A protein has these predicted regions:
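Terminal, charged accessory segments of proteins
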Residues: 1-177
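Catalytic core segments in nucleotide and nucleic-acid processing enzymes
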Residues: 183
Length: 183
């Protein structure tokens, strides 16, 4: 039996991003594999992040519009001849939840749904995926796991670390090693 409460407390203290008093309702559970344990930790962490709100950022978009929005890209409008259709190519910033951190979390949840975890955990992850409907899926092989965190996204540090462990099929041990999930 692995006490998930103790592991979650350890992670919350290690990352100093979570307040431990929010997790007093946890108990011990039986986990038959590490994927189940990581899925439980990720499930609880994502639920807390959803209460805070998903991280958002400004993403640059370029598309053909009939009304001016943002900056006008005249050279691209001439090349694609959108002016003949009474449209123009505009470049503008959109405040979106489709950030790299959210993409990593969504892709990891989708990967966990294919893993050998219980049906109740899969159902819980599917319910959480509903909040990530506007977020694109990415290939985790090409993710730069050495992200820099600031005050606005430091709450993602533990979640991304858990996603890294899930992707690589690792669990952190107390012995010295080369893998870091926290700077």
């Amino acid at each position: 039996m692995i006490p998930v409460q103790n592991i979650y407390y350890m992670l919350s203290y290690a990352f100093q991003a979570l307040q431990a008093q929010n997790y007093k309702d946890l108990a011990t559970e039986k986990f038959h594999n590490t994927a189940e344990l990581c899925a439980a930790i990720l499930d609880k962490g994502i639920s807390v992040q959803l209460k805070r709100g998903l991280g958002r950022d400004y993403l640059s978009k370029s598309e053909s519009l009939s009304t001016l929005q943002g900056r006008l890209n005249i050279s691209e409008s001439i090349k694609t001849q959108t002016l003949l259709k009474k449209q123009m190519i505009c470049i503008y910033d959109e405040f979106s939840t489709n950030t790299q951190f959210n993409q990593i979390i969504k892709s990891t949840m989708l990967m966990l749904l294919k893993a050998n975890i219980t049906n109740t955990r899969k159902k819980s992850l599917r319910n959480l995926l509903l909040f990530f409907s506007d977020v694109n899926e990415i290939d985790l092989r090409f993710v730069n796991w050495n992200q820099h965190y600031n005050r606005s996204n430091q709450s993602y540090q533990m979640l991304i670390g858990i996603c890294y462990l899930i992707y690589n099929g690792l669990l952190q041990t107390q012995s010295d090693g080369a893998t870091k999930i926290m700077d």
